[in-house]
Amino acid sequence: EIIKCDWSSDVCSSDLFFFQTSMKAFAMQQISFSQMEYAGKKRVTSRERFLGEMEQVVPWSVLLDALTPYYPKGKRGRPPIGLERMLRVYFIQQWYGLSDEGVEDAITDSQALRNFVGIDLSRESAPDATTLLQFRHLLEKHDLTRTLFARINAQLEAQGLMMKEGTIADATLLPAPPSTKNEEKARDPEMHQTKKGNQWYFGMKAHIGVDSQSGLVHTVTGTAAHVGDVTETANLLHGEETDVFLDAGYTGIEKREEVQGKQVTWHVAMKRGKLKAMVEDKLKALYVKRERLKASIRAKVEHPFHVLKNLFHYRKVRYKGLFKNTVQLHMLFGLVNLVLAKKKLLALHAQGAS
């Protein structure tokens, strides 16, 4: 027999309250068990290790100071998510190559990510995709990733990790979707086609200027893929370098109008065919030795690209247009610099703590 209850009565109301309270307590107990189990596990995953290192090397206060004047104060409507929490979510997106929706799912699924962001799912949910989209639009509107990139580099320079005596310049291709099967029935008009070797690419280029001593990126620009590397060189110099190292694709740079008057020594790789055609003698041996030395210095420019493409999984453009993608590149290379300087920064952090 089903017992019907008038929930307006004191007895049934108290029973309902007891039931609801018991269920909440049970849920909280279940969550605490999972958190205890997570905290008690012995093995530290690579993700936990990386997030722990980034917790220490990211100059949080400096970056937050740069963003605070632009972040909504929440005087009307729903209170905004805290700025530091939003920045942490945004960094997770860059580190792991996630979409806006993917970040929300990853934080919900991963206790390590929730700990890094500071979210307790028993009290709140992860920031949704729309919230992250609005934050990205804020960064784009005020060109704030360029500011964050500069702030990170200023911190690295202040700690003696960026010498600015020499620059290595290089570029990498970033493919864009070539298909016209979209709402506009057209490809991105700001992206272009170029040929490298025997293969054609459609997309853009990321050009970087790298400190020849540390291998850290000091300048970032973005162009369409068909723009020649040599034409962007002048924009990759900070003005304080005395030596510039370039591969053979930059041959003739010293003759270009935009670099006239710059007090630098150009170290451009000799083309392989020219070196190969030389007579085998002592002079060629000297040239070979010199080219190997230049190549060993230029090799440092590959390290930022390695972190970008293999660690951050950024191998193709994420958005339409050069501006939005260049905005992201500034943030990505700022974070790349922190990864490259990680060991030295952690050592300095340990010295400061002792």
Report residues per predicted region.
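Helix-centered, glycine/charged polyanion-binding patches within enzymatic domains
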Residues: S32-E37, T242-D243, A248-F323, V327
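Charged, often Cys/His-bearing segments associated with DNA-binding zinc-finger transcription factors
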Residues: S14-S61, T68, A347-S354
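A positively charged, amphipathic N-terminal helix/segment that binds anionic biomolecules
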Residues: L51-D65, Y70-R76, R85-E101
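Short Gly/Pro-enriched turn/cap motifs at secondary-structure boundaries
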Residues: I3, K196-W200, A295-S296
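Polybasic low-complexity intrinsically disordered regions
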Residues: F18, F26-E37, L83, I92, ...
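Single conserved hydrophobic/aromatic residue that forms the stacking wall/gate
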Residues: E1-D15
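Structural motif
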Residues: R76-L83, N198, K320-L329
